[in-house]
């Protein structure tokens, strides 16, 4: 197994590369390219807990708006922002995951888990009096039209398919008689799926719109948009976010057959994609999710848009201190498929071992990243790029090629919006991408891009009528090199490819040069 660009260049295609793997290989310097998203729940909603997760590998904090009050979510945002201050310049991104057009059960009394046995007959109801009083006889769901779209013989799944109910009879306009097909528990606020059923829910509910406005007010960095079914859904979300939320990245969650069928138009509109395997694995046969994951990730890689793999990645660690071998392989396969980020849900929101789960995921990601044949991957992505490419993308491709030929330790990019960093990330260099920006929002959402280490430059933009443009550029480069060395992403004296614009502002990246990292004076001469 190789660590440097020269090692990668010495081997041929994927099969030859994999045949050379050394399972005991330890690179001289490890850096993780794939970001880790952690859902924050009551067990981890504190500055101390978030910093523990961060030290273990957290990059993005996720808030699930299917649960919790605005007061609770405000506390998550406040705690994440406070935790970020412990390491100034190292941003923590904040993601708002919408409820979307989903269906959920009501609450059980005192949030208890009610055991249920296979063969049990009960009523699924939309009667509001059971909303906070679900029992073994009556389980509330929040979709008022469920009796109109379901039919006897159909299956209703609850809690990512953990519970399955066969529809026996439509009793009245509020009640469905069902039979449990397996043992399990009736719990509070669990997701409900109706496979092979046309659900007439709007893409954005009034709650979703209010939640998005809350996100804009609190300057969240990204929105994970649930149950996206068509490209127009993304446009509708952008309209709600408005001018004040124009920098918020929209990540389309693909969770049903309609989203899969319309994926090309969704990809054209969205900033990124999440393979939300929980609901997807119920809405389509579970065996198809494997292929769907690979297809979605590949299409995102070709488009250069970030993609997240989520759901049940280390599910057993909700209760157990160590993951299963299958879970570690699942994480590794997501990485080798090409995911930019991997996500933890219940593992960090309510699990008994949240920090350990992040640490295990980080270790699994690192090992998987070392198995990827980066050079052949780069060549294939270059061949698939639609010509003519933009000037910025051409510069990104050239900088990655230079990093391979030079065996560079890093690519350092000065970016306003993060676009140039995204395009460099698209071509998957062997080395890390150090992104320096003055854009507070971009410094956070750049965690979506594989291999990017974003840093917020602390100095405000100068008046270029008084300050030389190139002097400001050099100052940012020196600062970035210094931080790279300080975080051990770089070693003193190593070669770095620097990517920059010829003037300030977005879309002007067209130049790269080669420098040496020197911790003493950080000179910018040619190596």
UniProtKB/Swiss-Prot annotation:
- EC assignment: the record states 2.7.1.40
Which family, according to the similarity comment? Belongs to the pyruvate kinase family.
Q: In which pathway does it act?
A: Carbohydrate degradation; glycolysis; pyruvate from D-glyceraldehyde 3-phosphate: step 5/5
Q: Which cofactor does it need?
A: Mg(2+); K(+)
InterPro entries reported in the protein's UniProt record: Pyr_Knase, Pyrv/PenolPyrv_kinase-like_dom, Pyrv_kinase-like_dom_sf, Pyrv_Knase-like_insert_dom_sf, Pyrv_Knase_AS, Pyrv_Knase_brl, Pyrv_Knase_C, Pyrv_Knase_C_sf
Write down what this protein is called. Answer: Pyruvate kinase
**Taxonomic superkingdom:** Eukaryota
**Annotated site, Transition state stabilizer, chain positions:** 253
Binding positions for ATP per the UniProt entry = 64-67, 104, 190
UniProt cross-references to PANTHER family, sorted A to Z: PYRUVATE KINASE (PTHR11817)
| Subunit | Homotetramer.
Catalysed reactions listed for this entry? pyruvate + ATP = phosphoenolpyruvate + ADP + H(+)
Residues of the signal peptide: none
Q: Which UniProt keywords apply?
A: ATP-binding, Glycolysis, Kinase, Magnesium, Metal-binding, Nucleotide-binding, Potassium, Pyruvate, Transferase
Q: Which residues participate in Mg(2+) binding?
A: 255, 279
Question: Record-annotated residues binding K(+)?
Answer: 64, 66, 97-98
Gene Ontology CC: cytoplasm
Q: Which organism is it from?
A: Neurospora crassa (strain ATCC 24698 / 74-OR23-1A / CBS 708.71 / DSM 1257 / FGSC 987)
- Transmembrane helix among the record's keywords? no
The top EC class is: transferase
User: Recorded GO terms, molecular function?
Assistant: ATP binding; kinase activity; magnesium ion binding; potassium ion binding; pyruvate kinase activity
Q: Name one GO biological process term.
A: glycolytic process
In the UniProt record, does the keyword DNA-binding occur? no
Tell me the residue numbers annotated for binding substrate. 62, 278-279, 311
